[in-house]
Amino acid sequence: MGSINRAGIAGDLKTMRIHIAVLLTMFLAPLSAIADPEFFDEGPMAGKGYPFSESVRVGNILFISGQVGVDENNELVEGGITGETRQIISNIGGALARRGLGFSDVVKCTVFLADVAEWGEFNTIYTSYFEPPYPARSALGANGLALGARLEVECVAAYPSD
């Protein structure tokens, strides 16, 4: 077995500390430059008295509130998981378009399913709108979704760098 070179370890630790300091500066500096949030209340659920905004922009990030399969009359669409999924993705597309973005700008989605067994049906429709590279995504079972919906989807999108 070889011996431990303590001078080499000390040098590696010093280099590692410098790298950590540089990384912290890179990640923490932008936090101080974050813009004030902009709140947008548009889309099919706007003006209905719900206690949330359709979307919120902070800097170059757009947060889209959870969407359920409601149409412009605030009615849950028919067709179960298939009809609701298509309506939700249409609603998300509208929220993105109103802010000058598209599906390719989405970086994260969270999917809440009343019945996880319907994940496959949802996924088939989802992949017809989102293309590789796909956004990061979580999917989980949820009991008691708003308006008796089969699913709810929220997304985060990023504005392209200038």
Regions found by a protein language model. Give the residues of each.
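Residue-identity detector for glycine
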Residues: 2, 8-11
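Proteins with a high burden of low-complexity, intrinsically disordered sequence enriched in S/T/G/P/A and R
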Residues: 5-6, 99
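Positively charged n-region of N-terminal signal peptides that target proteins for export
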Residues: 14-19
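N-terminal presequence-like segments and the immediate start of the first folded domain
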Residues: 20-27, 31-90, 94-108, 113-162
